[in-house]
């Protein structure tokens, strides 16, 4: 929350029109000015998120890890896993079988791919905020049904 503006990601939002002005519907987000600060979470660390050890392997860039673990995801599935070393971050889209929250099974892969893109954005924002120079390589998933897919590699300069 900044300046009393709140956002909510409607991961399973539905629209009447699947296309508008030649653009396909992808995702829905609500943005609103909130006049009552009590409606905001005061301590982000009290939100329901996976433990750091479930999403981050390695002892590097833990200050960044402790922020990016709060990246929003559909139904809080947090479908990512990072392997960290001094000179590299490897980001995987990780799908634990059977874990999908309330999300319909046929939508898991679709929303998890959007989630991983949002996660990459958070990583890059944190790297930039910490003045950490990097080169990103995106990887095409060969088989989206795999439990773990390499999505991006960040070479730290």
What are these regions (language model features)?
Residues 1-157:
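Acidic, surface-exposed loops and disordered segments
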């Amino acid at each position: 929350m900044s300046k009393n503006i709140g956002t909510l990601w409607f991961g399973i939002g539905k629209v009447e029109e699947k296309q508008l002005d030649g653009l396909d519907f992808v995702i829905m987000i609500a943005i609103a000015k909130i006049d009552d600060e009590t409606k905001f979470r005061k301590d982000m660390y009290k939100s329901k998120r996976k433990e750091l050890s479930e999403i981050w392997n390695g002892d590097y860039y833990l200050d960044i890890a402790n922020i990016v673990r709060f990246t929003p995801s559909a139904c809080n599935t947090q479908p990512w896993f990072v392997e960290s070393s001094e000179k590299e971050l490897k980001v995987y889209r990780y799908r634990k079988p059977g874990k999908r929250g309330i999300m319909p099974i046929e939508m898991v892969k679709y929303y998890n791919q959007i989630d991983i893109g949002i996660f990459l954005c958070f990583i890059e924002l944190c790297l930039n905020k910490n003045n950490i120079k990097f080169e990103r390589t995106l990887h095409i998933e060969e088989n989206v049904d795999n439990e773990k897919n390499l999505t991006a590699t960040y070479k730290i300069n």
